Amino acid sequence: MDDQPTPQHTRPEGVSDETVEAVGKLSAALDHIEDARGHLYAFHRLMGSAESTLEEATELVRDAGHTDLADALDRDALGANPLPGMWSFQMVDEFDDGFYARAKGLHQRAVDELMGGRRHVFEAEMKELRRTRDGREGHEATPAEVTDDPEYDG
């Protein structure tokens, strides 16, 4: 074991601390955007479930003899856009094709132009500062150091 990070997680020659920090912060921002995108997808899935459940509820209300309320549910809720002109799938499409695509593209540009295509250099350097180098389990530099160990049973 050479106990070193892999080359794709090391700082390219001549890259400043400030640049590593800036790209690390940009990566953190993209992480938040990815989380927001996940919540948007969760919203989309919940709205789909809500639509199906609302359809069932409308029929049950109708079957229970409450035609006026069932008609109002049919007219004013079932199939209605949660936002003007859009169902949740359209919100996802707009987000993915708009802001998300631009943010992801700009992040990739920063990684390519400023870090020579190397991702997570800021985090890799943080790991190197914090981990021990005494062979302690759980402090290996790379997964290969674990999977190459004869005692590894994964």
Describe the residue ranges of each PLM region.
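C-terminal-biased regions
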Residues: M1-R62, T67-G154
